[in-house]
Amino acid sequence: FHDIPTTVKRACYVASELGVWMLNVHAMGGNDMLSAAKEGVDQSNQNPYLIGVTVLTSMNNDNLNEIGINHSMNKQILKLALNVSTHKLDGIVCGASDIKGMKPSLPKDFIYVTPGIRLLSNANNDQKRIISPEDAIKAGSSILVVGRPITESKNPALTAEEILKKIS
């Protein structure tokens, strides 16, 4: 979610009550929004993982500059990750290649959800920061997000099996 704090708090509460196992909020929503998200989840009788989205893997440094962020991608991701950690969220969404530089600064049990996973045979599509499944695991990814490589495959089940073999 990415909205005003009151709306995010309610959305996180309702999503939690519906039984989701994980939900995410955009870390650039700010301190009040992150606190509200955590409150919404904590008020629920459920206990989903609450994850903060740092910088989308479809973005690069040029895209950050376009929206007024004039420091490096790595600095922005670390800044957001530290803020997510301060607000006691369970982890972040980031590119797998972003993990190594910030892992020592974050909690040991922090969850790293990583999109932009591609097989060598896959197109990048709109992803700018991609990585193979096996390299994502080596980099420290906790949860891989694999969408189009499977959903747009001629044989989705076979592709999913291929990915699982690569990370086993």
List the model feature ranges, each with a label.
Residues 23, 84, 102, 136, ...:
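Conserved, mostly hydrophobic/aromatic
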Residues 98-102, 127-135:
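Short glycine-rich, acidic/polar surface loops and turns
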